Amino acid sequence: MVLSDAEWHLVLNIWAKVEADVAGHGQDILIRLFKGHPETLEKFDKFKHLKTEAEMKASEDLKKHGNTVLTALGGILKKKGHHEAELKPLAQSHATKHKIPIKYLEFISDAIIHVLHSRHPAEFGADAQAAMNKALELFRKDIAAKYKELGFQG
């Protein structure tokens, strides 16, 4: 799967909006993930005690983790598909240490699309959403291949 230059432009254009508030976007995305798929919360010992959206919004640790997640994803997106070096340690930790199933990466991808659209409706129309979906699918496909190399059937 390959994205065109125009698609990468759309992806990176919206990502510039994310970078204006990485932690805030990340927190919103994680809250959306945990509310929509409560089972994902079980993978995070640090956040298991957060039961309500208000508790999640008040959590500095959740905000910090959102920043970490989106900083890593931004680094991958900026490589425009040439992300082998960035993907390898991420796949290693998510497969062997955290044991994060690929399905959960699909869930967070959906949360990313939803939050970007809700925060930036004018800049994140159908074409930009399609491009971001494609970029996130490429990321998931490549991380799934790394999982397989590591013997993780996530």
Swiss-Prot record:
<dbReference type="GO" id="GO:0016528">
    <property type="term" value="C:sarcoplasm"/>
</dbReference>
<keyword id="KW-0963">Cytoplasm</keyword>
<keyword id="KW-0349">Heme</keyword>
<feature type="binding site">
    <location>
        <position position="65"/>
    </location>
    <ligand>
        <name>O2</name>
    </ligand>
</feature>
<protein>
    <recommendedName>
        <fullName>Myoglobin</fullName>
        <ecNumber>1.7.-.-</ecNumber>
        <ecNumber>1.11.1.-</ecNumber>
    </recommendedName>
</protein>
<dbReference type="GO" id="GO:0019825">
    <property type="term" value="F:oxygen binding"/>
</dbReference>
<keyword id="KW-0479">Metal-binding</keyword>
<feature type="domain" description="Globin">
    <location>
        <begin position="2"/>
        <end position="148"/>
    </location>
</feature>
<dbReference type="GO" id="GO:0004601">
    <property type="term" value="F:peroxidase activity"/>
</dbReference>
<dbReference type="GO" id="GO:0098809">
    <property type="term" value="F:nitrite reductase activity"/>
</dbReference>
<feature type="modified residue" description="Phosphothreonine">
    <location>
        <position position="68"/>
    </location>
</feature>
<comment type="function">
    <text>Monomeric heme protein which primary function is to store oxygen and facilitate its diffusion within muscle tissues. Reversibly binds oxygen through a pentacoordinated heme iron and enables its timely and efficient release as needed during periods of heightened demand. Depending on the oxidative conditions of tissues and cells, and in addition to its ability to bind oxygen, it also has a nitrite reductase activity whereby it regulates the production of bioactive nitric oxide.</text>
</comment>
<feature type="modified residue" description="Phosphoserine">
    <location>
        <position position="4"/>
    </location>
</feature>
<feature type="binding site" description="proximal binding residue">
    <location>
        <position position="94"/>
    </location>
    <ligand>
        <name>heme b</name>
    </ligand>
</feature>
<dbReference type="GO" id="GO:0020037">
    <property type="term" value="F:heme binding"/>
</dbReference>
<dbReference type="GO" id="GO:0070062">
    <property type="term" value="C:extracellular exosome"/>
</dbReference>
<dbReference type="GO" id="GO:0019430">
    <property type="term" value="P:removal of superoxide radicals"/>
</dbReference>
<keyword id="KW-0813">Transport</keyword>
<dbReference type="Pfam" id="PF00042">
    <property type="entry name" value="Globin"/>
</dbReference>
<dbReference type="GO" id="GO:0005344">
    <property type="term" value="F:oxygen carrier activity"/>
</dbReference>
<feature type="binding site">
    <location>
        <position position="65"/>
    </location>
    <ligand>
        <name>nitrite</name>
    </ligand>
</feature>
<keyword id="KW-0408">Iron</keyword>
<comment type="subunit">
    <text>Monomeric.</text>
</comment>
<dbReference type="InterPro" id="IPR009050">
    <property type="entry name" value="Globin-like_sf"/>
</dbReference>
<dbReference type="InterPro" id="IPR000971">
    <property type="entry name" value="Globin"/>
</dbReference>
<dbReference type="GO" id="GO:0046872">
    <property type="term" value="F:metal ion binding"/>
</dbReference>
<dbReference type="InterPro" id="IPR002335">
    <property type="entry name" value="Myoglobin"/>
</dbReference>
<keyword id="KW-0560">Oxidoreductase</keyword>
<comment type="similarity">
    <text>Belongs to the globin family.</text>
</comment>
<keyword id="KW-0514">Muscle protein</keyword>
<keyword id="KW-0561">Oxygen transport</keyword>
<keyword id="KW-0597">Phosphoprotein</keyword>
